């Protein structure tokens, strides 16, 4: 068998259904849209959430909450991600962005205690969880809130 003799397995490729190409095709005349009505017209159809004139669910339910304009979202770094740095490294937010550990700094960096830390590091971040502080200090490293 040669490359030009390869054939797709039977039934693995679905043939595109061309509508409006004669009665014999099975999808001629109205092209599977039925007779008249909003859904038969070009550009026709109802908007998402429309329930035929009945008050839609999203309007029947009460509004809840608000968006806090002062919300701070922190970029999360876990302990096991810090293992990629050499012993004695000073880990700063700039270094974390540069090495691709976090994509962008957002409102700051928060170090969480997931995973285990194997290196002695000086970590500078905006926030630390209690378990992260414990793990960093246990390895002889230091943490600094900036």
From Swiss-Prot:
Q: Which NCBIfam families match?
A: rplO_bact
Gene Ontology terms describing biological process: translation
Enumerate the HAMAP family for this protein. Ribosomal_uL15
Record's superkingdom?
A: Bacteria
> By what name is this protein known?
Large ribosomal subunit protein uL15
User: Which terms are listed as keywords in the entry?
Assistant: Ribonucleoprotein, Ribosomal protein, RNA-binding, rRNA-binding
Q: Where is the region Disordered?
A: 1-56
Question: Which SUPFAM superfamilies does the UniProt record give?
Answer: Ribosomal proteins L15p and L18e
Segments of skewed composition (Basic and acidic residues)? 1-13
Record has Ribonucleoprotein as a keyword: yes
Organism in which the protein naturally occurs:
Staphylococcus haemolyticus (strain JCSC1435)
Q: What is the lineage of its organism?
A: Bacteria, Bacillati, Bacillota, Bacilli, Bacillales
For bias kind Gly residues, which ranges apply? 21-35, 42-52
Q: Which GO terms describe its molecular function?
A: rRNA binding; structural constituent of ribosome
> What function does the entry list?
Binds to the 23S rRNA.
Q: Which PROSITE patterns match?
A: RIBOSOMAL_L15
């Amino acid at each position: 068998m040669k490359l030009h003799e390869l054939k797709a397995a039977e039934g693995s490729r679905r043939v595109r259904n061309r509508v409006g190409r004669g009665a014999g095709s099975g999808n001629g005349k109205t092209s599977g849209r039925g007779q008249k009505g909003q859904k038969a017209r070009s550009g026709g159809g109802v908007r998402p959430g429309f329930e035929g004139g009945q008050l839609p669910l999203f309007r029947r339910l009460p509004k809840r909450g608000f968006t806090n304009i002062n919300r701070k979202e922190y970029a999360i770094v876990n302990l096991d991600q810090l293992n990629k740095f050499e012993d004695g490294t000073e880990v700063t937010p700039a270094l974390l962005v540069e090495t691709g550990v976090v994509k962008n700094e957002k409102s700051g960096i928060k170090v969480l205690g997931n995973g285990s830390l194997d290196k002695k590091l000086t970590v500078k971040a905006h926030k630390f969880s209690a378990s992260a502080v414990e793990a960093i200090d246990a390895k002889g490293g230091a943490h600094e809130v900036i």
